[in-house]
């Protein structure tokens, strides 16, 4: 469960990075 949350946060950060760029 925690692993999934960490993965989601990682994807969210990547998506945010791409959006900011």
From Swiss-Prot:
Key word Phosphoprotein present: no
Residue numbers of Serine amide PTMs: 21
Record GO terms (molecular function): toxin activity
Family under the similarity heading: Belongs to the cationic peptide 04 (cupiennin) family. 09 subfamily.
Protein's name according to its UniProt entry: Cupiennin-6c
Domain of life per record: Eukaryota
Coiled coil: none
Organs and tissues of expression: Expressed by the venom gland.
Keywords: Amidation, Secreted, Toxin
GO cellular component, as recorded: extracellular region
Localization terms from the record: Secreted
């Amino acid at each position: 469960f925690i692993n999934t949350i960490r993965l989601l946060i990682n994807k969210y950060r990547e998506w945010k990075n791409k959006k900011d760029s």
